[in-house]
Amino acid sequence: MKKFKLNSPYKPLGDQPKAINSLVDGINKGEKEQTLLGVTGSGKTFTMANVIEKVQKPTLVISHNKTLAAQLYEEFKEFFPDNAVEYFVSYYDYYQPEAYVPRTDTFIDKESSVNEEIDIMRHSATQSLLSRDDVIVVSSVSCIYGIGSPEDYGEFAFGIAVGDNYDRSDIIRKLVFMQYERNDIEFARGHFRVRGDVIEINPVHGTPPVRVELFGDEIDAISLIDKVTGKKTESLKRYMIFPAKHFVVGQDKMDTAIRNISDELDERLNEFNLSNKLLEAQRLEQRTRFDIEMLQEMGYCPGVENYSMHLSGRKWGEKPYSLLKYFPEDYLTIIDESHVTLPQIRGMYNGDRARKETLVEHGFRLPSAKENRPLRFDEFESSINQIIYVSATPGAYELSRSSNIVEQIIRPTGLVDPEVIIRPVKGQVEDLLGEVKKRAKKDERVLVTTLTKKMAEDLTDYYAKIGVKVRYMHSEIDTLERIDIVDDLRRGTFDVLVGVNLLREGLDLPEVSLVAILDADKEGFLRNETSLIQTIGRAARNINGQVIMYVDEMTDSVKNATAITSKRRKIQIKYNEKHGIVPKTTKRALKDKKVAEDLDIEGTDISKIPKDELRLLISDLENDMKEAAAKLDFERAASLRDQIATLKGLKKDSS
C-alpha cells in the first residue's frame, strides 16, 4: 500500500504532466540535483505534490520565510490529509540574540518570546520523523540550525504498553531525565503529575494528556484524558513518550560534558590571565560556573545550546545536529524559490559566526559556543540526499549543478505571460498617468516600481494631487498594515500601488493588469535579470496583463528579461491555439474584513470599559490569539497579542 496518497480533485494539466514524469524519472535514476523552472502561476506546488506521491520518499520542503512556509504547509496538508505534514520554523515570536558592542561596552542579553504553538509543531515534526516514514516537513531555514542529537532524542523516548512491568519511580525518573517537570498543581505542556499509582503526562507535541494507571509494578491501564475535566476520552493499549526538549543528555554524557566544559574554562581563564584580561576572565568564570552548577543540579541551564558541542560529544569543527539529521538516508529535499532561499542558507553561518566571535573575545562565552551554529553551506550540501530546486528564475548555482532542468511554462489556467512594452524614460510619469487612467476605467489595478523611496513618495504625492487613487508601500509599514493595503488594492479602494521592492510583498494579484517599471535600465539588485523577470510575473494573473519598462538604454538585463518573457509568451499562445484553450483571469476570493471580531483599540475609549468586562475581554482575546496561532495566522495572532498587552496595561493602571 502507498504511504503517500495525494488527495485533489484536479488532474495535472499544461506542462505539469511532463514536468512530473521528468522529475520522477530523474529521482528513480538516482539524479542528485534537478531544477523545476516554473513560471508564476503554473502550479509548481501541485507538481511537487505529485512527485512526492510517485517517489514515496519522506520530504523536506525549505522556504525562505515563515509566511511562505505557512502557505506551503497549508497546501501540502490539503494534498496529503492522511499523512504527517509538519511545520518547522523558528519558535521565536521575538528574538534578540545575546551580543556585545565593544565600542560602547554594552552587553545585550538574549531576550526572546517563544510561540508555544510553533514549539508544539517543532516537536511534532521530530517525533513524526522518528516514528513514521510518510512525513513531509515544511520548514524555513531554521532546519539548518542546531538542535539536539536525534540519537539522544530517540534513545530517551520510551514506549509503554498495558501489562508492562514498570515501577512507578522508574517512570518518574525517566520523565525527569526527559526534561518533564513535575507539577501537581499546574498541568501545563511538558509537565506531569502523580496521584498515588496514577501518573498523568501532558506531552509537548500537542496531543491530549495521557494517564498511566499502575497496579503494583504493572501498567494496568493507559488512556487519553481531557486536560480540563480529567475525564477519559480514549483507552490505549500502548503509548510512546518523547522528550520534552530537543536537548536531552544521559547522565554519563552529562558528566563527561561537564568535565570538558570545566577543562575548557580553565584553559580559557589561563589565556585571559596571561593576557592581563582580568575583567574578561572574571566575567567568563562567573557565568560558566553558574551554568555548570545548573547542569549538575537540573540537567539544563539558560542558553544550554551554547554547550551543545560538549553535550552532544562533537569534536571542534564537526557538523552540528540539525533537522536534516532526523530524516532517513533516502529522503527528498525541495528548495522553494531557490534563487532567494539558497543565498539565505549560504549566509546564515557567517552572520552567526561574527556575533559569537565578539562574545567569545570579551569573555561572555567559551570558544566552544561558536560550535552552536547553523550548518555551513558545504555541510548543508553534504547532508542532502536528492534535491529539486524550484523557481521561476533559478540562479547560476542551481542551473550549473542540475543534471535535469525541467521547464513548466504552460499554465493550467491558459494564462500567458504579459506583453512587455519598452518606452523611453523621458515623460515616463505622464505616459504612465495615461495608462493608469485606462486601467481605472476598466476596474483594473496597477503596480509601479521605482528606484528609490524618495521617487516613490514624490510620484505618489504627484498622482494623489491630480486625483489618482494611489497608495505607497515601503519597508517601514508593518505586516498587518501591508496586508490591509493589498486588500484595499484588490477591493478597488485605490487603483495604483507604488513601491521600491514590490517583489518581497508576494503581490500575485489577479486584479493587477499593468506593472510599470520606472528607470528599468538602471542596473542593480532590483533591475537585474532575475528581479525583472520576477517583477514581470506580477502581471501574469490577469488576462489583460501588460508590463511597461521605461528605459533609455537596452541593458543586457532588460534584453534578456524581455526575450525570455516573449519566448514563453509565444509558446503559451501556440499551445492555447492548438488545444482550443481560452485563458481566464485567475479567480481568488476576497476574505470578509473582520469588523467586530477583533477589538479596534485605537478607535475605542477603553478607559470606559468596566473592570469585569475588561477581564472577560482579555480572556476572549487570549483564546482568539491561540486559535489564530494554531491556524498559522501569525499576523492576526500578533495583532491580538498587542491588543492584549494594551488591555493588561490598562487593567494594571486601574487596579
UniProtKB/Swiss-Prot annotation:
Which segments constitute the Helicase C-terminal domain?
Answer: 428-590
Q: Does the keyword DNA damage apply?
A: yes
Record's keyword annotation contains Nucleotide-binding = yes
* Helicase ATP-binding domain: residues covered: 25-181
Compartments (UniProt record): Cytoplasm
On subunit structure and binding partners, the annotation says: Forms a heterotetramer with UvrA during the search for lesions. Interacts with UvrC in an incision complex.
Q: What is known of its domains?
A: The beta-hairpin motif is involved in DNA binding.
The similarity comment for this entry is: Belongs to the UvrB family.
List the protein's name. UvrABC system protein B
Organism of provenance: Methanobrevibacter smithii (strain ATCC 35061 / DSM 861 / OCM 144 / PS)
Gene name of the encoded protein = uvrB
